[in-house]
Amino acid sequence: MTEMNATEATEKKSLNFIEQAVENDLKEGKNGGKVQTRFPPEPNGYLHIGHAKAICLDFGIAARYGGVCNLRFDDTNPTKEDMEYVEAIKEDIQWLGFQWGNEYYASDYFQQLWDFAVNLIKEGKAYIDEQNSEQIAAQKGTPTQPGTESPYRNRPVEESLELFNKMNSGEIEEGKMVLRAKIDMASPNMHFRDPIIYRVVKTPHHRTGETWKAYPMYDFAHGQSDYFEGVTHSLCTLEFVPHRPLYDLFVDWVKEGKDLDDNRPHQYEFNKLNLNYTLMSKRNLLILVKEHLVNGWDDPRMPTLCGFRRRGYSPESIRKFVDKIGYTTYDALNDFALLESAVREDLNSRATRVSAVINPVKLIITNYPEGQVEEMEAINNPEDPSAGTHTIEFSRELWIERDDFMEDAPKKYFRMTPGQEVRLKSGYIVKCTGCKKDDNGNMVEVYCEYDPDSKTGMPGSNRKIKGTIHWVSCAHCLPAEVRLYDRLWKVENPRDEMAAIREAKNCDALEAMKEMINPDSLNILTNCYVEKYLADAKPLDYLQFQRIGYFNVDKDSTPEHLVFNRTVSLKDTWSKINK
């Protein structure tokens, strides 16, 4: 973790029960005073905003208490995993501002896990079951009714050992048999009812190739991997609460009764990040990508970290948002407006102010000398004096926002209308004198006169003018494409709504998504103009288009065709773009 992030972590507000648990362990001298966490993503998709909450906790706890957070890829399902996701996950973690101590993979422990499973078979704690998944599920019982024992539950140890080896040799087809832990089919905890701990998967693994055909299940690999690595605090989300007894049991078994009260990982659960108007299941996000409902994993409408990055969110804003919502032991639906507020607050302090006109109409200053060009000084960021200034050219013909002119304006309209003065930001005070329309009544030109003594910085500029508008010089600007992004979904809770649609219409997830998707989630404007200062702007440069919103350069942008993404609109009521 960088020095900045370590400082930020220590300045965060209390992490409540998790922080208290860690502090209690340290006071009691557990784990030799060590704090070690891990972030264990499965490399089967791109990280989303929900993962950011887990990342901030895993790395933040380690930083706060002088420990280490390792990165471990839970690569136990080769059918869905790929090195593309491994590299993308690492990039996202580092972009978010964190650096792991060691990089591990569950596949690093395949041999140890195999040996552990063999030992369980020898001890009579595991057996090969040749029933199919439907039969096994039917025998599970219910939370109030005990399950039914498998007819293979008491098969000879030697037979289970032989079949287990055949599972891994390639002799057994997928779905024909599994290895189950022998625990308690009458346990009130359904996860104790002889859980499957190994299954056959013949898809080559992205790291181990075809070495293995039998793969451990998540519940069997996770706790043991924590133990092998020396994790002290295993942090996960609330759905794993009922898994914790099984986690503890497998750790007890792998430790073979040694040091049960110390030097072992303990699992703690916290609430997931749920956002309204957001769908975060990787399974559903994959459908969006594969069916081209979005333009890839990094589409700025996606809740993926790479999507937020491309849209122009700063890592600091995401960390601040996560810190603001905190960690609890109950689930809640958070308002997306909180995330937007966090990015506005952060970008306000770091974004460079520039001029851009996204719905242009020409303004002609009729008494300004033809051919004259002035360089006006524009402040880069009024919140940060050290950010300096840049120059913007001013001339007789300017582009202004079409919405900044109204021929018959109401009384409280303070922008450009005949007979009224407005201030051209960083320039002069002008008075509107009229306009010109085409044969269809469309506005094509607006006319005004300027006060030569009212240039910004001159004494004449000090008189009170209620309206200020932005502009760019027609002869000194650059054409640009501007992409205005909005919510991808038109329903507040797309997860629940999708379930309701599927049940009501007996349709698949894709059809339900098509019904929920917001047709106005992307509006592309091609007739826009930006000041020349942006000719060298690069992706991840944070910008504020004055009076419009926060933007950044898209990766599709080229010097010949500039493309800007709206990160978030301004909250000001005079913003020219509807939210």
What do the PLM-derived regions correspond to, one by one?
Residues 85-111, 116-119, 124-127:
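A glycine-rich helix N-cap at a beta->alpha junction
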Residues 13-90, 206-237:
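N-terminal catalytic cores of NTP/NDP-binding nucleotidyl/phosphoryl-transfer enzymes
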Residues 1-13, 579:
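Basic/polar N-terminal segments that are highly enriched at the extreme N-terminus
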Residues 71, 75-77, 83, 105, ...:
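Active-site cores that bind ATP or allylic diphosphates and position pyrophosphate for catalysis
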Residues 40-43, 72-80, 102-111, 134, ...:
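Conserved short loop/turn motifs at secondary-structure junctions
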Residues 262-342:
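Long, charged, mostly alpha-helical binding arms that flank functional sites
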Residues 240, 244, 248-250, 316-319, ...:
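Core subunits and conserved enzymes of cellular information-processing
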Residues 29, 58, 89, 120, ...:
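Residue-level signal for inorganic ion chemistry
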